[in-house]
């Protein structure tokens, strides 16, 4: 049974402005594993990756119902499976989780569905 659904839409240029003012912003948002992947990319791909992880984590926080106030970005990790699809590899939710991240032009959108295992 679906117990939560969260959606987030983010302008990539807004993330870029924050990142340009404070490059440590990426360390606040990304886990150690995510940061290693982020650092392997060229600049433009880094921005898309960072914005995608931001949006995915915001969508997760909305789906679980707490928002990012009670969770931190470090409580949530989004990596890719062997096919390159994003998956939630770390979160406080114990059920099944499904995530989709899409980029188009200057926007990134993420959707998270949480499903109870019962």
From Swiss-Prot:
Reactions catalysed, as given in the entry: apo-[ACP] + CoA = holo-[ACP] + adenosine 3',5'-bisphosphate + H(+)
Cell compartments where the protein resides: Cytoplasm
Main location: cytoplasm
GO cellular component: cytoplasm
Entry's EC annotation: 2.7.8.7
HAMAP family: AcpS
Similarity-based family: Belongs to the P-Pant transferase superfamily. AcpS family.
Protein name: Holo-[acyl-carrier-protein] synthase
